[in-house]
């Protein structure tokens, strides 16, 4: 169990440009702070999205297809094209605890306008897409 000063989840957000569609967007990865020794699980997440809000509700863990034993964080990754301007992102954990971050999303840049209260969620942004999801 995490100490109260350690986050339960980390949210990585980075700008993305889709060469195929020629559209700007963001890449988002939510992962557990906890490292699992047996498998690198996927997070099962229910998404609710509208133009200015994104709600991510963690439902649980699932083993990825073709999973081989590996150590790692449980993860959920997704790309979004429709989120622009000021966007509120809320993460809801399995126990119902929530944290909300306010992001300003413009092409090639993501700025944290308001960080979540408490230490449940750590938010990490980068303007360098190549390094955004490095372990």
What is the meaning of each model-derived region?
Residues 115-135:
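Compositionally biased low-complexity segments at domain edges in trafficked proteins
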Residues 83-92:
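A short tyrosine-centered beta-strand micro-motif
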Residues 25-27, 53, 73-75, 98:
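Intrinsic-disorder/low-complexity, polar/charged segments enriched in Ser/Thr/Lys/Arg/Asp/Glu/Gln
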Residues 13, 32-65:
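Contiguous segments within soluble domain cores/interaction surfaces
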